[in-house]
């Protein structure tokens, strides 16, 4: 979870002999999109908010030391009069929280769930800078083109590359 990377950062700084110049920095970035929403017509309308969340820790040289990637896909239906049909009091779990219940494993060419693929990408970027993350080769659908990453990640990663770079750029020393 995002809390795990923040705790990891605090633990690393606590055990570090670095001064404030050499301590880890923590970055968080979230971006949302409504592009999957649909107007009501003959059928009910859908408002769908997709939010990508990335948390990183980076060292004094800008190298990623830890990364967590998650996403929330919140959906609500409404009728042609604009009346909400969805119970808005029901919590919306993140894709990491859903795990196997998200249901990607059965349709993925590599049999991996979304959370497993996000973790594989997060692991892959550890040891890289923001520029190196942005330089990861992708195809026209922004899916990994590098063989070792493509063997564990089949989802589009272009948005994640940008979100990781933004999290690195926003990283601040939080202290421990």
Q: Locations of the language-model features?
A:
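Active-site- and interface-proximal helix/loop "cap" or "latch" segments in soluble metabolic
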Residues: 1-176
């Amino acid at each position: 979870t995002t809390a795990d990377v923040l705790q990891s950062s605090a633990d690393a700084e606590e055990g570090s002999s670095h001064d404030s110049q050499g301590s880890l920095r923590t970055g968080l970035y979230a971006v949302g999109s409504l592009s999957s929403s649909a107007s009501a017509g003959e059928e009910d309308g859908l408002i769908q908010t997709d939010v990508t969340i990335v948390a990183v820790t980076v060292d004094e040289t800008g190298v990623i030391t830890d990364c967590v990637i998650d996403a929330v896909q919140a959906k609500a239906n409404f009728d042609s009069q604009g009346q909400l049909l969805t119970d808005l009091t029901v919590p919306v779990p993140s894709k990491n929280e859903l795990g196997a219940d998200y249901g990607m494993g059965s349709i993925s060419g590599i049999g991996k769930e979304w959370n497993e693929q996000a973790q594989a990408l997060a692991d892959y970027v550890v040891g890289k800078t923001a520029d190196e993350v942005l330089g990861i080769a992708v195809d026209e659908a922004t899916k990994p083109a590098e063989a070792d990453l493509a063997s564990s990640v089949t989802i589009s990663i272009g948005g994640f590359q940008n979100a990781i770079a933004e999290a690195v750029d926003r990283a601040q020393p939080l202290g421990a």
